[in-house]
Amino acid sequence: MSVSALSSDRQIENLIVRYSHLGDEGNLAEFGALFDEADFVFGELTLRGGKAIEDLIGSTLVVHEDGTPRTRHITTNILIEVDETNGSAVARSSYNILQTAPDLLPLQVVGGGRYSDRFVRRNDAWHFARREVTIDFTGDTRFHLKGQQSA
């Protein structure tokens, strides 16, 4: 099935989920490319373009020997509102980040929060226009974020 054959809701949901998969796989180049023509907002920081986001994530996340951050982003409560006439959409969702590492057992939640997204349709496909990431909860991030202190 081609992308254009999918409903707008489904295409947008796929983008939301692709973000999680690419991050969990450690594929930072494709992760950043999701925002080639989009804003990525994290607290007071706003970045635009794939390379800027790739560089930010690469300088922030711990990548383990297997080439991944050893995480699973679980995105839930996805609420999508599409304006087909204007080729725009908004979405809200919640996320939890699970992680395990040799020195971080058992599997645990290291963070959780919300995504607030805007999308635009270009060339019959949906793309991120803006993602705002809010962190509501954090756990033991020593093996997830660079520069964290040992417990």
Report each predicted region and the residues it spans.
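Short, cysteine-centered beta-strand-loop-beta hairpins and adjacent loop/turn segments enriched
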Residues: 98-108, 138-139
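Short beta-strand segments enriched in hydrophobic/aromatic residues
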Residues: 23, 35-36, 95-97, 132-135
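Short beta-strand edge/turn micro-motifs at domain boundaries
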Residues: 88-90, 112-143
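Short, low-complexity N-terminal intrinsically disordered segments enriched in polar/charged residues
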Residues: 1-33
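A solvent-exposed, acidic/Ser-Thr-rich amphipathic alpha-helical stretch
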Residues: 28-96
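Extended, polar beta-sheet/loop recognition surfaces of beta-rich domains
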Residues: 141-151
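Beta-strand elements of well-folded, non-transmembrane domains
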Residues: 95-99, 119-121
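Transmembrane beta-barrel outer-membrane domains
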Residues: 10, 71, 108-110
